[in-house]
Amino acid sequence: MFEKFTKEARRAVTLAVDEAEIRGDSRINTEHLLLGVSNTAGLGQLGLSPEPLRRQLDRLDAEALEAVGIDPRLINEAVEDSRPTVKKRGHIPFTEAAKDVLKQALREAIELKDRHIGVEHIALALTTLSPKDRAVRALDGIDLDPAELRVSLIRALRKAS
């Protein structure tokens, strides 16, 4: 399937892997794909930029810890102190949800009669996720409505073709 991805879409997936490594996560999930997509050119004009999303994901992490009575600052300090200096950890697997997003990106491209899967198709696939998904919650947290983002993405794709 990756042979159908544009250069920029492949870059977004590579950036998602990098985001998982940076965050110290053991698997690549939907929020990593969202961060990867937001790091590519062209989607910033739609309000999709990485720094606000990273801050929102950090807030979601902190809220989850606080919900079970853990002080997030103590966890952050412990993690920073114990994090190894080695950057690459080898293969990081994709979660089923992240794989489903990539499959949905293919379906989005087919539905729009596009020959290749671009960053926009991955972003469109992310807008189809459940409201409980961390990627959707991150979008909501920066006041980006997934349905409105979807309309803007489709409009941009139609304008480009």
Q: Would you name each region that the model predicts?
A:
Residues 1-161:
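Histone-fold recognition with a strong bias for associated Lys/Arg-rich disordered tails
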